[in-house]
Amino acid sequence: MGEFNEYDDIDDFFCNDISPLHDEADEFGSTDIALPSQLYGKGPKPRAGESKALRDRNKESGSGTESEAKGDTLATKRGRSSWRRGASESSRSSSLGSSSPSDSSSGRSLSPVRPAKRKRTDEQQPESEANRFLAEMERDIELSAGPGGGETATGKGGRDTDARVYNVGFISRIEGSRNRRVNVKVTGQKQFATFLAIALAAFSKQHNIRKSLKPKYQADQVKIYREGVEVFKFMTCDSFNIEEPYNASATDIEVYIVPVDEATAFEQEWKRKFEERVRMLSNSSFLEVMDDIEDDNDDFLVNEYEKALVNARSLNETELAVREGTPADESSQLLKIVLLGSDNKKVFIHVRPTTTLLKVAEHYRVAKELPPTVQLSLMFDHEEIDLDDTICNIDIEDGDIIEVVVK
């Protein structure tokens, strides 16, 4: 009996389809079915009534049939294993054969594609460099817009355009720090939005603003004005196109911080004061210079356009006197004097020698926004002076200080 195989049961199940075996006694042949008992070497039980000789003959024929069946079974197994190996080899060969043309065809088809990919990479390289350059520019702008940033940008002639320095004087119109001043030194390319918050924080800290008023000291709750014109927060000091000083010193700029809800009233007030100032220039002999602003540097000069008007007016009067054949009047000379109030705040004005002290007192009343019911008296050299006198009668010189007493 052959060795036991775990796949014999499976083979026994498929062994019903065995090719017919020809017997010499049967010329037509007979189909033998390989039973499991024959494959495992177990013969059928003898039937009753069979003789011993018949059983021996059947046994001999059964052993022959069993050996032939075993041979057929082994041949069938070998055929199947060889067929499986052949099928696997043929499948591998077919797969290799089918892949080789595809590989070759794909290789041929990819050969023009690979240079195209490299070409696209080459085309994208300048674009990435451009994007990198733009990103660096944006980063430089953000750094220059920051509180301590500021990358130098080269202008015409290779000169640094942001090297110009400005002293920005913020004058507050906000409750809690009204008419107070904070100076901020910045470069010309910084936007007002970047250092406005610094000025507001300085006002709040310096004057101990109470908690209920601190919401008014936010950048979105105020507007900026320069000479009555609103300054947008994205603007810079260079946007004003102010002529640079000949010695390249810092340029002084004066702006007002006004609450949003008071902006309209401030514009109307500024317009009224400007019209009054023009009327005073045309009808009187003195010029308003400063407002009631507290500053460490009280000797702050007047606006450039007002000084230009004064100089032009004096020149015209002198030329008119020369044309008429008369000498130029000495009264056309302007003197700069200082009005000092009890609050130690200075108001600068330009007067002529023929200007009366009453007009000087009225100018102080307008500058301080005092009501008409308030009485004013002027003191010079610790003596009260008559308001009907003129500047030349009291021997007031350029730069003298006149004290103002409010009664």
Curated annotation (Swiss-Prot):
Top-rank lineage group of the source organism: Eukaryota
Cross-referenced CDD domains: Ubl_SLD2_Esc2_like (cd17080)
GO CC terms, sorted: cytoplasm; nucleus
Per-repeat ranges for SUMO-like region: 129-253, 334-407
Keywords, in A-Z order: Coiled coil, Cytoplasm, Nucleus, Repeat, Repressor, Transcription, Transcription regulation
Biased composition annotated in UniProt, kind: Basic and acidic residues: 47-60
Subunit (UniProt): Component of a cullin-RING ligase (CRL)-like complex composed of at least the cullin RTT101, a linker protein MMS1, and the potential substrate receptor ESC2.
General function of this protein: May be a substrate targeting component of a cullin-RING-based E3 ubiquitin-protein ligase complex RTT101(MMS1-ESC2). Involved in HMR and telomere silencing via the recruitment or stabilizing of the SIR (silent information regulators) complex.
Protein name from the UniProt record: Protein ESC2
Species classification: Eukaryota, Fungi, Dikarya, Ascomycota, Saccharomycotina
Gene behind this protein: ESC2
